[in-house]
Amino acid sequence: MILILRSKRQVNMANEKLTAISPLDGRYADKTEELSRIFSEYGLIKYRVEIEIRWLQMLANNSEIIELDKFDTDTNNQLNQIIDNFDVSDAESVKEIEKTTNHDVKAVEYFISRQFNDHKNINDFIHFGCTSEDINNLAYAMMLKEARESILNPLMISLHKEIKGLALKHRDTPMLSRTHGQTASPTTVGKEFANVLSRLNIINNELNEINIYGKLNGAVGNFNAHHIAYPECDWLEISSKFIKSLNLEPNLVTTQIEPHDWMAKYCHNLIRYNTVLLDMSRDIWGYISLGYFKQRLEKNEVGSSTMPHKINPIDFENAEGNLGLANSLFGHFAEKLPISRFQRDLTDSTVQRNLGVAIGYGVIAIKSLLKGINKLEIDEIVINNDIENRWEVLGEAIQTVMRRYGIPEPYEKLKTLTRGNKITKSILSDFVQSMDIPDHAKNGLLNLTPSTYIGLASKLTNLSK
């Protein structure tokens, strides 16, 4: 017998997943692990530490702040190492300090100052002129920027690639359309995926064009403390330069808080992106139900606890559920965050701590869709059998050609012929033969079938990028 020994740490990690309140840190922890370095309490503290140190270094580089000597190489290296080597144990130290301060940002300030106990000159300028929100708004801005660049964009690109592959592979595969749930003019399987891809690309491009703003201007946004201490300094320029050094856009005219308008735009963008995915998930679910799409069998998976035959569309259902959760949170963020009483209230603090939760649900959804799409197979036999028995969809083609050649009441005549009736090829052929139109037009209609009446679907699919 082979005994598999697990370390205490491994056991603790397993227990943490089992006892987590949120499924993001429990059942789905393996799918959201990459988010924890950004949006966890550790991640937030790490960004706060970085911002405090970078602000201190900028002040030291300003020759007009004569009470703070320019840092030598050793001091700068020591400060940089605090950022570069910051780990969970450091975050735990900050949390221990917070037990005394009962203030999370002040705890960060004290954590840094303890690294320089013998340098009162340095400690006096840690958090200089700042309100907590100066640090926090920049931290959340950097977090959302990092999430966009290192997590959301790569996932979106992967999803777009899979959708594009299906679009191009099946651009010429005719499929019956349905409007209002009823048969409609044919399309192609690929064109329907191209529709989704086009929407996603537009929204993703807009996401990447959103400017991410930050502010550092003091307790009510007027540089009161900065200006009274050093009136000779150009604090507007110093603040702008600092924020730009973090690869953010400066917002100089604010109250105590950066107003979060860009954040609302970011959230609204992800709502729109997720809504397109929700639309696609439901359509794929429907096509699976119709038998148009099949799911590749995974040998050891179980579809139902009682019905052995089932292969359920669980990936698309999982995506749908998580997209709904993400959007409900993003909607609240977008409505709540731009509102703050007078110059500031604290209601945004607890709300912003959940930004990673909303993104996490979206990440789970995209990963579920990638898994589901990779198991999809198109059943062209079922699709073809369905479309070839729906001759009534050619009513549109016939009445439109009749219009061209001036035949009276074309729509009304086709409505009488087709609406509510079982239409066959022979019925349509007899009707076309009776029409007074040029032979070439008549032959074109006689040779037309439901599967060839796809317009420019294939050409349009090729436009998808």
Which ranges hold each PLM region?
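Short amphipathic alpha-helical segments with heptad-repeat character
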Residues: K145-N153, I157, A194-L197, N201, ...
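N-terminal amphipathic/basic-hydrophobic helices that include classical n-h-c signal peptides
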Residues: M1-N12
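A structural signal for small-residue-enriched, beta-sheet-centric alpha/beta enzyme cores
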Residues: S132, H227-Y230, P250-I257, I383, ...
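Acidic, glycine-rich loop-and-beta core segments that form the ion-binding/anion-interacting portion
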Residues: W235-F316, E320
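A helix-coil-helix interface module used to build multimeric assemblies
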Residues: A14-F223, Y230-S239, G303-S304, F316, ...
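Generic, well-ordered alpha-helical scaffold segments in large soluble proteins
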Residues: W55-L59, F111, Q115, A147, ...
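Conserved helix-loop functional segments at active or binding sites
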Residues: K169-T173, E206-E209, Y213, K244, ...
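Glycine-rich cofactor/substrate-binding loops
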Residues: A14-K46, I97-N102, G291-Y292, S304-K465
